[in-house]
Amino acid sequence: KELVGIIGPNGSGKSTLLKCIYRILKPDAGAVYLDGEELHSMSVKSSARKMAVVAQHNYYNFDFTVREVVLMGRAPHKKTLERDNAKDYQIVDEALKTVQMETFADRTFSTLSGGEQQRVILARALAQQTPALILDEPTNHLDITHQIMLMELVKKLNVTVISAIHDLNI
């Protein structure tokens, strides 16, 4: 697996490129391929089984608990209306532990700091268990300790990582 860094100044299109890769935007020209298949011809669920995203900004219109947010990462592996099972909860608990947020599982997402929210979103991506991980400025809201933790974690993952990042020292 490899780590691909997208580097550039503010406004250079890093996030726009990533949004094309993770289907928020459709390219004006050309196409994005994933495993040899044009991304926009795949179902959203199929592409979500292959890549997880940690976006720069994450908003929820409802106040979910941390555990509920991370459980959303399991959705691509489920049939319609299939309930979460013991294996899902085990995966979620492990993901929360990996990002040092296990003690926050029952807190609501909106009560967390920006850095804590970013770590929960990373846990959601880990719970998704995909071969590729897209990171859009993943260290934006993190203090230096958690920036280093995140980058060390990313290095250990056996997945392809595409990341836009500002700080080349991390």
Residue ranges of model-derived segments:
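Hydrophobic anchor residue at the start of the ABC signature
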Residues: L122, L150
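Conserved ABC ATPase signature
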Residues: E82-R83, T108-L112, E116
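Conserved ABC transporter NBD signature motif
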Residues: G30-E38, S47
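Helix-to-loop junction immediately C-terminal to a conserved catalytic motif
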Residues: Y22
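Conserved ABC ATPase "signature" region
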Residues: L71, A86-F104, Q129
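The feature captures the beta-strand-to-loop junction immediately N-terminal to the Walker
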Residues: I7-P9
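Catalytic Walker B motif of ABC-type/P-loop ATPase nucleotide-binding domains
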Residues: L133-E137, L142
